[in-house]
């Protein structure tokens, strides 16, 4: 299966008539493996800061998680594995695998829990595959 197929079929999938606003799979080096058409244009330093938070949990808390110029307040995640952020009625979930970061961005009516399930399910599968 190609990386764009993972984004289209597994991240941008329909959940009770709703879907993520945007999604992407990005390598630890900041290279885009695949992304939805709606995924924001991000800066390399934004991805570097996210990677740093996986290595040093809590490093994003004082400044927030920034992606494509949007600032998300960092909320409880799983240190070293999942970062979650909130902005208004929406937010972001980032799951780290061995080689990539899985991004899911949502807005109402999709819930944070639904976003977490979508992103973390694919991330767990890729981890099982050694990716």
From Swiss-Prot:
Gene3D superfamilies: Dynein light chain 2a, cytoplasmic. SUPFAM superfamilies: Profilin (actin-binding protein). One of its GO terms (cellular component) is cell cortex. GO terms for molecular function: actin monomer binding. The keyword Isomerase does not apply. It comes from the Eukaryota. This is Profilin-4. It comes from Olea europaea.
């Amino acid at each position: 299966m190609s990386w764009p197929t993972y984004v289209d079929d597994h991240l941008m999938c329909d959940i009770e008539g709703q879907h993520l606003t945007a999604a992407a799979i990005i390598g630890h080096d900041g290279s885009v493996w695949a992304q939805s058409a709606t995924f924001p244009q991000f800066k390399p330093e934004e991805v570097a800061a996210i990677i740093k938070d996986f290595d040093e949990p809590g490093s994003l808390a004082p400044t927030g998680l920034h992606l494509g110029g949007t600032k998300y307040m960092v909320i409880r995640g799983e240190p070293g594995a999942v970062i979650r952020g909130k902005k208004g009625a929406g937010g972001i979930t980032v799951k780290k695998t061995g080689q990539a970061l899985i991004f899911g961005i949502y807005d109402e009516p999709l819930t944070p829990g639904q976003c977490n399930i979508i992103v973390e399910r694919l991330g767990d599968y890729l981890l099982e595959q050694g990716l």
